[in-house]
Amino acid sequence: ASDVYKRQNLAAVIDPGDEPELIQEALEKEGVEVRYLLLTHGHYDHTTAVPALHRVYPQADIYIHQADANGAGSTLFPLTGEVDDLKLYDEGDVIRLGDHEIQVLHTPGHSPGSVTLKVEDVLFTGDTLFAGSCGRTDLRGGSYEQIMQSLKRLGELKGDFHVCPGHEATSTLERERRSNPFLMEAMRS
């Protein structure tokens, strides 16, 4: 699964996990200039299409959090050795796309370098927050305590947001505050 955030004929592709040809076809149909490939974390199901897309869009900067940039050869982190010009982002960084700002929130737990990308009233949560659930923490580098802290942080954001997770259905933050058992538990702590 991947998301495309577009503004003023510019695009950021978020978590291009597979099917680079379909992503490219959609981007060409939209007639946008791809500026960024933004990764919420480094697992293969969010990064597999990156090398192919970067060959087509070499001008696009690839961003990932430092904690997931060095995959140490794990099959979960296939970018290691395939893409050598990764740019690193961290908590508080801002990526500009036209006149819009994409804010980086470090939300570890699913992986050490998991981030949520906040832009306008949208949260691209990767595998941190799902509709009705949260990402698994039993993979290498995962931490239940950290994901609960990250969920609490997201739940405490002021206002409502559209939630675009890395898998399954979209939601709203307000709906998740009322019905997601993991988010509700995190906010009680």
What role is predicted for each listed range?
Residues 1-5:
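Short, small-residue-biased leader/transition segments that mark boundaries at the very start
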Residues 6-10, 94-103, 118-121:
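Beta-strand-turn-beta hairpins that frame and shape the catalytic cleft
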Residues 7-16, 30, 74-79, 101-106, 111-189:
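Metallo-beta-lactamase
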Residues 8, 32, 58-59, 119-122, ...:
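Short glycine/proline-enriched coil/turn segments at helix->beta-strand junctions
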Residues 12, 38, 62, 124, ...:
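Residue-level marker for buried hydrophobic side chains located in beta-strands
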Residues 13-14, 39-40, 83, 105-106, ...:
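Short, flexible loop segments at the rims of nucleotide/cofactor-binding pockets, characterized by
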Residues 18-100, 178-185:
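Active-site HxH/HxHxD metal-binding segment of metal-dependent hydrolases
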